[in-house]
């Protein structure tokens, strides 16, 4: 999250022409471009350049959210809270606080305009924090019911990744359980439609992990 660590939040960085060149190069390679961005001006610039997915976007305003919906661009946000990260300087802490304070507004606008929502985290780069990813899923309860959350993190995420077209490395459909699909499945000890926070304790509550048809964990 370079923009929090070093840059000003209002910096838009790349010119539209530069982003457009990246989009065309990606299209030539059969895939798409996503951008990590927070502020309305930068989000709008990216969309105008042909970007298909906005990562983060927490400082978005209503006009820009309406643009995302109209252009059918994906928005991949995270339910940030003040205790997510401990930044070393006061300036970095203040920038993180601004993002956290607008997270509620961003999710409410996304629901209002029925934007296509994906979900992901940056925690994969920090093995010690990887277990906290499932806690972030639970935080989505502030805006979505459990069915909406499960659909977002499975089926909807798979739809987003399918934008990679011919470069998609998976031989079957993702995010669904059906014959011929890519066999990634979890068996949970409990009903996550009733209690999404079961996922926050994977050691005890995830009984079976199947990835690409191979069993990686079996506590049955």
What is the predicted function of each stretch?
Residues 13-19, 100, 169-180, 205-209:
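Glycine-rich, flexible loop segments associated with nucleotide phosphate handling
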Residues 90-97, 171, 199-202:
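Short, surface-exposed loop/helix-turn segments at secondary-structure junctions
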Residues 28, 32, 101-191:
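His/Asp/Glu-enriched, well-ordered alpha-helical/loop segment
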Residues 20, 66, 150-151, 197:
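Generic structural signal for individual residues within well-ordered alpha-helical segments
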Residues 167-168, 179-220:
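C-terminal cap of metal-dependent C-N hydrolases
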Residues 37, 46, 67-69, 110-112, ...:
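Extracellular/periplasmic catalytic domains that process cell-envelope and extracellular macromolecules
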């Amino acid at each position: 999250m370079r923009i929090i660590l070093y840059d000003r939040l209002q910096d838009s960085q790349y010119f539209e022409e530069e982003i457009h060149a990246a989009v065309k190069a990606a299209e030539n390679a059969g895939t798409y471009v996503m951008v990590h961005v927070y502020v309305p001006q930068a989000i709008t610039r990216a969309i105008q350049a042909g970007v298909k997915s906005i990562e983060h976007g927490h400082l978005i305003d209503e006009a820009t959210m309406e643009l995302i919906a109209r252009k059918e661009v994906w928005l991949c946000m995270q339910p940030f809270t003040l205790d997510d990260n401990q930044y070393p300087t006061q300036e970095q802490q203040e920038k993180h606080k601004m993002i956290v304070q607008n997270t509620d507004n961003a999710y409410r606008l996304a629901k209002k305009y029925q934007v296509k929502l994906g979900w992901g985290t940056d925690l994969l780069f920090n093995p010690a924090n990887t277990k906290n990813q499932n806690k972030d899923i639970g935080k989505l309860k502030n805006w979505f019911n459990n069915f909406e959350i499960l659909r977002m993190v499975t089926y909807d995420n798979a739809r987003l990744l399918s934008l990679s077209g011919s470069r998609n490395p998976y031989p079957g459909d993702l995010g669904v359980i059906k014959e011929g699909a890519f066999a990634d499945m979890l068996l949970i000890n409990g009903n996550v439609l009733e209690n999404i926070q079961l996922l926050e304790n994977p050691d005890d509550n995830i009984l079976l992990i199947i990835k690409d048809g191979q069993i990686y964990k079996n506590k049955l």
